[in-house]
Amino acid sequence: MSDQESVVSFNSQNTSMVDVEGQQPQQYVPSKTNSRANQLKLTKTETVKSLQDLGVTSAAPVPDINAPQTAKNNIFPEEYTMETPSGLVPVATLQSMGRTASALSRTRTKQLNRTATNSSSTGKEEMEEEETEEREDQSGENELDPEIEFVTFVTGDPENPHNWPSWVRWSYTVLLSILVICVAYGSACISGGLGTVEKKYHVGMEAAILSCSLMVIGFSLGPLIWSPVSDLYGRRVAYFVSMGLYVIFNIPCALAPNLGCLLACRFLCGVWSSSGLCLVGGSIADMFPSETRGKAIAFFAFAPYVGPVVGPLVNGFISVSTGRMDLIFWVNMAFAGVMWIISSAIPETYAPVILKRKAARLRKETGNPKIMTEQEAQGVSMSEMMRACLLRPLYFAVTEPVLVATCFYVCLIYSLLYAFFFAFPVIFGELYGYKDNLVGLMFIPIVIGALWALATTFYCENKYLQIVKQRKPTPEDRLLGAKIGAPFAAIALWILGATAYKHIIWVGPASAGLAFGFGMVLIYYSLNNYIIDCYVQYASSALATKVFLRSAGGAAFPLFTIQMYHKLNLHWGSWLLAFISTAMIALPFAFSYWGKGLRHKLSKKDYSIDSVEM
């Protein structure tokens, strides 16, 4: 009998063996086997040496933005982004490298103490409480079983979305961006035919506008459902269920016997379809490494702002030619149905779920019940789920002035877009006498400006990559796009107010859309990346704060836009918004120069990448 066979026979009831030399991936022997000969099969796992060769150290890095929100106290955050030769990393090996909950807790405490020196006394108290919580959560009682083996992607793994062919990843990126356009289109589809709502239900314009606003409100609440669903079951399941419900609830919208039924169903349509807004960015990020995902994310930044513009553009013609409100929703349902089928055909991109399935397959093949992901090993923390999806976003909204200021600007731009949907009917409908179909055509310049901005984002991304090669980047390096776009958004409103005269050809006010479309996409693209980099440790929660505030603004603005233009007249209505937009131009420039100091002074804690030891 060979030496190796002797080891196998002797360790037939053990799940792991220690590789003393640490030169090659060690081997474990499963306690059970499914083979006909009932022979145990040696399976390689990683050693300290092999992990160190891959760059793993005793310090745990910041989890990727797409790491599960429901996981907590990770000792191996690299699991979802790293490829290893064997695809299995024993907890015992990680613990021998110092990756234990208690050791990482001590490191975290030092980081908190360093950050406290730049904070107010209130901030210090907050950090002391968090430090206590960290010690309690990461006590020795919560150390993982050393016999557990975490599953990772193997080197060159075809299951890893990062390894899919480039054309496949970009095809999925375009399709997912169209899904976002579909959802955003649905929110504004009725804005091209509000007269049909008034006529059918015998209500005023204010009541009809609610059919648009309530769906946008649904956008702010839906992520509370779909983010945890995505964490637990994957993107594909979330898209299939949510978009299926969205398609179904368009039927009662089309057949609603009264306004109350229509408004209730529109709100639920917003809740169901919001998965497209809160998950697609993650799906795109799943397919690209952090170094190259910026250009792909630019498509996601483009989509939610172009989608609503297509609504009045298409449905203005339906309203004028047929006068049927129900046809608007049938068309919306058809669009949503097509995207439901397409999104369901896109394979799962979420690494934690892919690895869960891989772990289940390996458990079955080897008979080793201790192969799992770290999320499975720790279990789903409902308290952390609520904290990440609800409590922490609300906490950020009242304690993080930098985040609130940034979100306010995003909210303003998004709100101005929805304001355009109701300002253009006043300007081109009441002043120029155009019908809804021609009013819808006036939104084309916004689309052109947005396409121009999409091309410009590639320039911004290339400049950022140049900075990355030269030095360690800061969150403020992400603000180039906002500095370019901010003046254009304000200029658009000044043009709109200055050209809203009947004796001036329609090209004057319509051209404002070019500048606004260009500025709005650049601002959103830039500030979205800035938020992620400033709050990298809790990026999902910070983005949830942004989605909530943005949707609230988008829902509120349509309710008073028409009245504002009637009370202040066409010029001062636009100029009032122009004054606000002009004042906000200073924000990206101020943050670019003083952002780091402001974050350290005003934030309760430094959540950026700078605060973490790599």
From Swiss-Prot:
CDD domains: MFS_Tpo1_MDR_like. Residues 99-122 have a biased composition (Polar residues). It holds the Pfam family MFS_1. Residues 1-173, 228-236, 288-297, 348-407, 459-478, 525-541, 596-614 are cytoplasmic. Residues 195-206, 258-266, 319-326, 429-437, 500-503, 563-574 are extracellular. Belongs to the major facilitator superfamily. DHA1 family. Polyamines/proton antiporter (TC 2.A.1.2.16) subfamily. This is Polyamine transporter 2. It comes from Saccharomyces cerevisiae (strain ATCC 204508 / S288c). The gene is TPO2.
